[in-house]
């Protein structure tokens, strides 16, 4: 038997390995995209694009060769460790009831099952990584095409197009393609393949042990936050080989009740449940009662005025940890491409603060392994902090503002930028969730008659209006609201 918490963390070392591979690939791709600004409109775009795409494909193949050997060795180590842990826990039950199972190391059938599980798990993941070179180069090619179209159409300058392309790949570049056509990251594919392989191999070993010992009753483990289709059968007892009534108790059929043996059922895709042998005739008490199952999802942790289950709190923390990784990856990718890293540095600081505040409020602990990004060390952290200190400021409302050299109708999502205008005044640009500018606050009238007539000293606002295609169709000027005056009192 493998505990849900063991299964949750079993792939961690392997995931860290493939996260490093992802980060290496991303920086290489970003560096190549950054070379776009060296091209002229008359350059042979198609030839350059082909050369860069082929170079990415070859680089990915070389990098995968470096990681594959380490990956296979770690899968073998993990499978052996997990199998040993599963059978040690199971055999303790047999010993407790006076039974003598064959030692795992001396059992040829069990060793054969372990080796078969390793080959299947390593093989399935190897099949996925075999698609990585084409998946990554395809995503790179599409990003290049979008960036080139934005530049050649005049929609964006080189720097903006490069930054948008790099940020998009940092956030969502796929690395593997499943036979169904679904694409995913190496991290997600690794967790799914290894967690499923480890759990299924452990389950097959336990089944073989039960056959050896003539046992037929099992109890399924339970954990908080189980998906609804799994919550109905977790923590209960079943009979292998069909439903039975035994010693005044009804036992449902193990496979039909839990879906064991199917991808969507017990020990299936990403499932952290497993089972262990029980002997009702020998008086073995159930590990789970209805009360203890209900307690798994008790809302007993308070955060921000509401009560949450432990599972919900853990997922909220995971989301904040992913945000830290996201902005580290963006920072490194932008840095490799030679793009402006200020916005990412600022978002990283905010994400780190959000995670620290959350764990402090909920009594949790920051897991540095879940926020680490290969290549983002002390030096990068120091540079990111410098970016924030020297390229941002705070307004009267406590909002962080990015200092820029020029205004643009596209900017940081839900962000604010500031520049000095031609008349020596200050313009603050506000952006919505889609990165489009929503308004501009200026502390002077730019020397324009309409704006100079507004406010006390020409201070005014422009609202930005776009049509359905995203084209700017108007920026009417108006008086500042009381709230806007208060928020921007530091420049008025």
Residue ranges and their predicted role:
Residues 285-298, 303, 475-492:
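Polybasic, low-complexity binding patches
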Residues 312, 390-492:
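Catalytic toxin/effector domains delivered as secreted proteins or via bacterial secretion systems
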Residues 100-101, 105, 111-112, 202-209, ...:
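Intrinsically disordered, low-complexity boundary segments flanking structured domains
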Residues 184-291:
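Acidic, glycine-rich two-metal-ion catalytic cores of nucleic acid-processing enzymes
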Residues 126-213:
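Contiguous, non-catalytic segments that form substrate-binding/exosite surfaces or channel walls
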Residues 205-208, 296-302, 408-414, 430:
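Short, charged, low-hydrophobicity "junction" segments
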Residues 1-165, 286-408, 438:
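N-terminal leader/targeting and assembly helices and adjacent pre-domain segments
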């Amino acid at each position: 038997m493998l505990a849900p918490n063991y299964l949750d963390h079993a792939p961690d070392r392997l995931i860290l390995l493939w996260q490093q591979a992802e980060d290496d690939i991303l920086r290489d791709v970003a560096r190549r995209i950054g070379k776009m600004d060296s091209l002229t409109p008359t350059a042979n775009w198609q030839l350059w694009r082909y050369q860069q795409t082929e170079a990415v494909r070859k680089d990915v193949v070389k990098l995968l060769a470096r990681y594959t050997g380490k990956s296979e060795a770690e899968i073998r180590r993990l499978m052996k460790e997990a199998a040993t842990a599963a059978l040690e826990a199971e055999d303790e039950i047999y010993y407790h009831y006076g039974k003598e199972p064959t030692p795992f190391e001396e059992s040829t059938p069990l060793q054969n099952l372990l080796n078969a599980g390793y080959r299947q798990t390593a093989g399935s993941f190897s099949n996925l990584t075999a698609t990585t070179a084409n998946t990554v180069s395809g995503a790179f090619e599409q990003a290049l095409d979008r960036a080139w179209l934005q530049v050649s159409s005049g929609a964006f300058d080189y720097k903006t197009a490069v930054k948008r392309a790099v940020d998009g790949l940092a956030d969502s570049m796929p690395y593997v393609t499943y036979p169904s056509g679904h694409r995913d990251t190496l991290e997600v594919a690794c967790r799914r393949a290894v967690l499923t392989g480890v759990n299924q191999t452990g389950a097959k070993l336990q089944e073989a042990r039960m056959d050896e010992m003539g046992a037929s009753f099992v109890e399924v483990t339970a954990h908080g936050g189980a998906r609804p289709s799994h919550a109905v059968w977790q923590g209960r007892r079943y009979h292998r080989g069909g439903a039975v009534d035994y010693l005044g108790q009804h036992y449902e059929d193990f496979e039909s009740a839990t879906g064991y043996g199917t991808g969507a059922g017990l020990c299936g895709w990403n499932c952290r449940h497993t089972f262990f042998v029980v002997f009702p005739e020998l008086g073995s008490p159930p590990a789970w009662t209805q009360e203890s199952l209900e307690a798994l999802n008790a809302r007993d942790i308070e955060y921000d005025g509401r009560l949450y289950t432990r599972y919900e709190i853990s997922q909220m923390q995971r989301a904040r940890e992913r945000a830290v990784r996201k902005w580290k990856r963006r920072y490194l990718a932008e840095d490799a491409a030679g793009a402006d890293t200020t916005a990412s540095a600022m978002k990283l600081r905010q994400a780190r603060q959000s995670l620290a505040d959350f764990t402090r409020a909920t009594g949790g602990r920051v897991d540095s392994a879940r926020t680490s990004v290969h290549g983002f060390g002390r030096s990068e952290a120091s540079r990111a902090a410098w970016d924030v200190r020297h390229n941002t400021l705070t307004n009267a409302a406590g909002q962080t503002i990015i200092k820029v050299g020029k205004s643009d109708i596209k900017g940081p999502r839900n962000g604010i930028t500031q520049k000095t205008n031609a008349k020596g005044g200050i313009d603050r640009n506000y952006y919505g969730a889609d990165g489009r500018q929503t308004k501009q606050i200026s502390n002077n009238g730019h020397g324009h008659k309409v704006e100079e007539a507004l406010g006390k000293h020409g201070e005014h606002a422009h609202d930005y209006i776009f049509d359905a295609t995203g084209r700017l169709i108007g920026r009417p000027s108006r008086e500042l609201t009381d709230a806007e005056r208060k928020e921007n009192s530091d420049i008025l």
